[in-house]
Amino acid sequence: MPDIGLEEVEVTEILVKIGEEIKLDQGLITVEGDKASMEIPSPISGIVKDITIKIGEKVKTSSIIMIFKVNNLNSIKNEKDLNYIKTEKKLNENFLEEKKDIKKIVLVHATPVVRRLARHLNVDLKNITPSGPKNRILKEDIELYIRNNTSNKSSFNIEKNNTTNFHKDLFNEIPITNIQQIIGKNLHQNWVNIPHVTQFDEVNITLLEEFRHKYNTEKKQKNNMCSKITILPFIIKSVAYGLLEFPIFNSSLSVNKKTIFLKKYVNVGIAVDVQNALFVPVLKNVDKKNIANLSSELIFLSKKAHENKLDASDMKDGCFTISNLGGIGGSWFSPIINSPEVAILGVSKALIKPLWNGKEFIPSLMLPLSLSYDHRVINGADAARFLTFIGKMLSDIRFLIM
């Protein structure tokens, strides 16, 4: 029984049978402690020769719960100062005749949650340096290992994609472009390295939409060639005010993760979907521009993106990113942070919903917003305040034009 931080636990479920062949990290038993149930994984691969515990029985750390026959000791790494699995000679006579020099088997100290995270990320726990009590591996140890080895592909046990060999007449192969590969790599790296949390909210934009439609109508009457202003410039401006009000959202984490850099400029990137690729042109000094200027610049950059004419200067020095899917549909989603930024705002399709005003239900246009943030830098309370502030800006046009 490995050390899971409790002296004694009760066995509530036995997940394997005698004679069954098990794999590394496969669940053996489920135990229940003072606060939660947890699954105890196998530290080795082998065949179950005996089960020494029963359901309802209480077991202590280091007590024998099962005995295995292991066919390949050469693949088992030796380490000192770790608990090891004991083998009874009388139950393994045939095996001991072939391998008399029994070596200690490594028992990695990690909770089932940490083990599942490692399996999901294809990380071998034996390569992790533990920092927890009693040499226990923590989730932070895995995150540190990944950050230190992201550029070194050989550090991971990347499993080959065992795609079924379909008959070639039954499917078409679509090559992944270089830009898609680069974008995919960056998205994966950001998702793995940044602890994402997403805050959701709805904003009443009824008055804003009335103002916007009236403004566009008047502009069209004066100049039929004038482009309509969409809701996005208003959102960009509200985000600019939010970044000034909450500077922690306009920051980046240092490489050594010990310092936060607060930026003295306000640049907002806009995710643009272009022919199966994703570009993020950046609007510079958003806090110093009015909504009409932002609308013109947004149209200009979007056109450059669709014509594949964006250069590096158009996509650098971003502080915060907005991903707008409102023109497509859907409600909420969890956008991936664009590192080294610490937050991103997702915008979905606005819908008419009944809103109670204290006396009656009023049809109101509600805009879903999804704020993903780096939990190492931003706490949940600040995220709620930031999103509430954005909602305040959008629900009353006077705040945006002052």
Curated annotation (Swiss-Prot):
GO cellular component entries: cytoplasm
Cofactor notes: Binds 1 lipoyl cofactor covalently.
Domain Peripheral subunit-binding (PSBD) intervals: 109-146
GO molecular function, one term: dihydrolipoyllysine-residue acetyltransferase activity
Cofactor requirements of the protein: (R)-lipoate
EC annotation from Swiss-Prot or TrEMBL: 2.3.1.12
GO biological process assignments: pyruvate decarboxylation to acetyl-CoA
Modified residues (N6-lipoyllysine): K35
UniProt domain Lipoyl-binding: residue ranges: 1-69
Family: Belongs to the 2-oxoacid dehydrogenase family.
Assembly and interaction partners: Forms a 24-polypeptide structural core with octahedral symmetry.
Protein name per the record: Dihydrolipoyllysine-residue acetyltransferase component of pyruvate dehydrogenase complex
UniProt organism field: Buchnera aphidicola subsp. Schizaphis graminum (strain Sg)
Lineage, highest ranks first: Bacteria, Pseudomonadati, Pseudomonadota, Gammaproteobacteria, Enterobacterales
